Amino acid sequence: RNLGKVIDTLTCGFADLMGYIPLVGAPLGGAARALAHGVRVLEDGVNYATGNLPGCSFSIFLLALLSCLTVPASAYQVRNSSGLYHVTNDCPNSSIVYEAADAILHTPGCVPCVHEGNVSRCWVAMTPTVATRDGKLPTTQLRRHIDLLVGSATLCSALYVGDLCGSVFLVGQLFTFSPRRHWTTQGCNCSI
């Protein structure tokens, strides 16, 4: 909505300036005013569409886009094995974002290697950032988190504090509140 005020000022100011041109000002000013009204209609449509989504507004959309900056786009990992450095794509502990019983959320560019019992084995990458133990995506735990996020977004929208809640969610991405459930190592040399 704030961006719309800037665009309105520019387009309407341009239309006024066009009206002051001698001889051709009247037709050019009218055309520029029509263009400014068309831009205003588009702005109103975008404001209506983004303002009526539960828990979303255009500024929340921009904050969500900026949240992509908190996760690296690609990575390579190096481990020190008896004085030698090996390039591996096994996730180090610093790349693990969230752990569930059967799924691990990690940064892109690596695959978790989990030590269970006396053996370390690679988990199956379902997406660039999600790996599971057996290649099946568990839905029970995901549904619980999705329900919590959707409920929070709806409540924030109903209380008209969507921007504040969006900011809190983004700051929350910087902190992990869940304990470690798996022992991840870098001894598997998993393939992506």
Swiss-Prot record:
GO annotation, biological process: clathrin-dependent endocytosis of virus by host cell; fusion of virus membrane with host endosome membrane; symbiont-mediated suppression of host innate immune response; virion attachment to host cell
Glycosylation positions in this chain: N80, N93, N118, N189
Residue segments, region Important for lipid droplets localization: 48-51
GO molecular function: RNA binding; structural molecule activity
Keywords: Apoptosis, Capsid protein, Clathrin-mediated endocytosis of virus by host, Fusion of virus membrane with host endosomal membrane, Fusion of virus membrane with host membrane, Glycoprotein, Host cytoplasm, Host endoplasmic reticulum, Host lipid droplet, Host membrane, Host mitochondrion, Host nucleus, Host-virus interaction, Inhibition of host innate immune response by virus, Interferon antiviral system evasion, Membrane, Oncogene, Ribonucleoprotein, RNA-binding, Transmembrane, Transmembrane helix, Ubl conjugation, Viral attachment to host cell, Viral envelope protein, Viral immunoevasion, Viral nucleoprotein, Viral penetration into host cytoplasm, Virion, Virus endocytosis by host, Virus entry into host cell
Topological domain spans for side Lumenal: 74-192
Pfam families in the record: HCV_core, HCV_env
GO CC term, one of those recorded: viral envelope
Residue stretch(es) of the prosequence: 62-75
UniProt region (Important for fusion), positions on chain: 149-180
Residues with site note (Cleavage): F61, L62, A75, Y76
Highest taxon above the source species: Viruses
Family: Belongs to the hepacivirus polyprotein family.
Protein's UniProt name: Genome polyprotein
